[in-house]
Amino acid sequence: MPKYYQYQIAGYYLYYTSHCIIECMHVHASDKKLTEGGSAKFFVNSDGSTVLQNRGILSDIEIGKIQKFIKINYLEMFEKWSMDSDKGFFDQQ
């Protein structure tokens, strides 16, 4: 599972899975096991805002920190995403 970054944000790794690149750009947030069970899933819009599809076990504070991080770094994250997927942002589908 490709990680967007090798470090954690609010205690979670941000990543995507190779089988989910058929969807528009999104970010999973999970613990060190990188399991989808209990993970959060954020769809990313072209302005860096996100739509939370699944909150998993994350608290409101953790979700807010991750959303803020994505908003600041979404273009860099999209470059990584685009290496594996031809799908664009959530609001461009």
Tell where the protein language model's regions lie, with residue ranges.
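Short linear sequence elements within intrinsically disordered, low-complexity coil regions
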Residues: Y12, C20-I21, D47-G48, E79, ...
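Residue-level signal for the start and early helices of compact helical domains
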Residues: Y5-Y7, Y16-S18, K33-T35, S49, ...
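Acidic, low-complexity intrinsically disordered segments
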Residues: N54-Q93
